[in-house]
């Protein structure tokens, strides 16, 4: 993955110098200062500048269309603004759906049960602060611990950040996971079941890199007895589970620039597919100006979207695959 980034930098450096728009110099420096961007070499900065300008143009045109009522969300030049969508996917979105996928659908739906029009588990104190996974494809681990954190809060009354690094380091080949090179939420749950626990984030902090497994049972903060999978593509069942059980781990198609540059509103990308590549956590749902949405917690830091969250279109034909592989753990 990192080799791909290096090749991009080398091949593009000369071209970058030719295409730089000097009228954007001041804004480039402001953006770098805002997000603490520093580059090791001039060639790297030249390439990043070119990518940044391309993304800036994309954001400006999209937001112009948004102002004319053509989109239900707007974009912003966040901390990922100097990256291509290919880089974001390579470094930060590495969901590995098992190739021989055999789902064990155990969720029992009750279609006659009346559900609330909106749910936000943050309001019930069941969601920890937004994390930043950095240049490590650990989205699956953050999605998994987020779902278990909510179950821990519901059972014990205590909200504890659990260790994503524990999963990155220890839930590995046996479970089909590859640390920073990707994994899947249900296999992470299975590791916690087999291991009889997971450490707290405080005792086993996140390092954004693969390490030797350092799990210590004396720092165990939560256990998992089983996990439940929901039927493929059923947004009605996903709504029921989110309302009645708690936050649900899901995968989405996040490969579009409109996703990683999302700022606010209800995200709807016509090019989105149901081929999921990024693990996130559905923590609620609702309606914004007539647009139904899923409230989704990401792991790209507070500078992404709405303080680290994105509202994704709901009841739009399983948009971006959000209801393709939902699951949640139980204690």
Curated annotation (Swiss-Prot):
A GO cellular-component term linked to this record: collagen-containing extracellular matrix
One GO-annotated biological process of the protein: antigen processing and presentation of exogenous peptide antigen via MHC class II
SUPFAM superfamilies: Cysteine proteinases
GO molecular function: collagen binding; cysteine-type endopeptidase activity; cysteine-type peptidase activity; fibronectin binding; laminin binding; proteoglycan binding; serine-type endopeptidase activity
Disulfide bond positions: 126-224, 136-180, 170-213, 272-320
Any single Pfam family the record assigns to this protein: Inhibitor_I29
Enzyme class at the top of the EC tree: hydrolase
Reaction(s) catalysed by this chain's protein: Similar to cathepsin L, but with much less activity on Z-Phe-Arg-|-NHMec, and more activity on the Z-Val-Val-Arg-|-Xaa compound
Signal peptide: 1-16
Compartments where located: Lysosome; Secreted; Cytoplasmic vesicle, Phagosome
Sugar-bearing residue positions: 104
Superkingdom of origin organism: Eukaryota
Residues excised as propeptide: 17-114
Active site: 139, 278, 298
Keyword Protease: yes
Chief location bin: other
Gene3D superfamilies noted in UniProt: Cysteine proteinases
EC number: 3.4.22.27
Keywords per UniProt: Cytoplasmic vesicle, Disulfide bond, Glycoprotein, Hydrolase, Lysosome, Protease, Secreted, Signal, Thiol protease, Zymogen
Role: Thiol protease. Key protease responsible for the removal of the invariant chain from MHC class II molecules and MHC class II antigen presentation. The bond-specificity of this proteinase is in part similar to the specificities of cathepsin L.
Family indicated by similarity: Belongs to the peptidase C1 family.
Assembly information from the UniProt record: Monomer.
Protein name in UniProt: Cathepsin S
Organism: Homo sapiens
Organism lineage string: Eukaryota, Metazoa, Chordata, Craniata, Vertebrata
UniProt gene name: CTSS
């Amino acid at each position: 993955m990192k080799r791909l980034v290096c090749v991009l930098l080398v091949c593009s450096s000369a071209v970058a110098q030719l295409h730089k728009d000097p009228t954007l110099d001041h804004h480039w420096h402001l953006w770098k200062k805002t997000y603490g961007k520093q580059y090791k070499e001039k060639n790297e900065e030249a390439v990043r500048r070119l990518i940044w300008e391309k993304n800036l143009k994309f954001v400006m045109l999209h937001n112009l269309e948004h102002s004319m009522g053509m989109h239900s969300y707007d974009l912003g030049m966040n901390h990922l603004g100097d990256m291509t969508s290919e880089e974001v996917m390579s470094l930060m979105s590495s969901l590995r759906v098992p190739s021989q996928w055999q789902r064990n659908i155990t969720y029992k739906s009750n279609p006659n049960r009346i559900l609330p029009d909106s749910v936000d588990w943050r309001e019930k104190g069941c969601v920890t602060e937004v994390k930043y996974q950095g240049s490590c494809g650990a989205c699956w681990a953050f999605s998994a611990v987020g779902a278990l954190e909510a179950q821990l809060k519901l059972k014990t009354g205590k909200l504890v950040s659990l260790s994503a690094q524990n999963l990155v380091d220890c839930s590995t080949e046996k479970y089909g996971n590859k640390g920073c090179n990707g994994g899947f939420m249900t296999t992470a749950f299975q590791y916690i079941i087999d291991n009889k626990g997971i450490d707290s984030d405080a005792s086993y902090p996140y390092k954004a890199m693969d390490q030797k497994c350092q799990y210590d049972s004396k720092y165990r903060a939560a256990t998992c007895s089983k996990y439940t999978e929901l039927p493929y593509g059923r947004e009605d069942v996903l709504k029921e589970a989110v309302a009645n059980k708690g936050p649900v781990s899901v995968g989405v198609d996040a490969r579009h620039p409109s996703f990683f540059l999302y700022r606010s509103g209800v995200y709807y990308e016509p090019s989105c597919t149901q081929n999921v590549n990024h693990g996130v956590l559905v923590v609620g749902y609702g309606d914004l100006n007539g647009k139904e949405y899923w409230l989704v917690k990401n792991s790209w830091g507070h500078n992404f979207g709405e303080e680290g969250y994105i509202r994704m279109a709901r009841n739009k034909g399983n948009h971006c695959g959000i209801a393709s592989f939902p699951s949640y753990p139980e204690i």
